[in-house]
């Protein structure tokens, strides 16, 4: 299994909106992607920092979302609420 970790910095007054979009739009779209297992969003309300962790069956399925434009479409949904571009990383899951 693999994980994609995306770190965002949102305007603190927009965090509830970011959470709602993640829950109501981004996660349902992820569920339609082949190999998607699950997602979690961690937030720090004081700083506006958010960390999304999504789990995928394989590295190929994780990377397919980036190649197809899926990742970019999801980031575009919250981009107006961000204070800087997101960062993304991918890891093999050693222990689940």
PLM segments and residue spans:
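Short S/T/G/P-rich N-terminal loop/turn motif that feeds into the first structured element of a domain
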Residues: 1-53, 57-69, 80-96
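Low-complexity, intrinsically disordered Gly/Pro/Thr-rich segments
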Residues: 72-77
């Amino acid at each position: 299994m693999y994980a994609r970790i995306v770190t965002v910095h949102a305007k603190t007054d927009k965090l509830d909106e970011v959470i709602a979009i993640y829950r109501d739009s981004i996660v349902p779209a992820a569920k339609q992607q082949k190999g998607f297992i699950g997602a979690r969003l961690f937030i720090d309300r004081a700083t506006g920092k958010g960390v999304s962790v999504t789990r995928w069956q394989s590295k190929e399925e994780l990377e397919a979302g980036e190649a197809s434009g899926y990742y970019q479409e999801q980031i575009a949904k919250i981009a107006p609420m961000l204070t800087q571009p997101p960062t993304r990383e991918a890891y093999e899951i050693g222990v689940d």
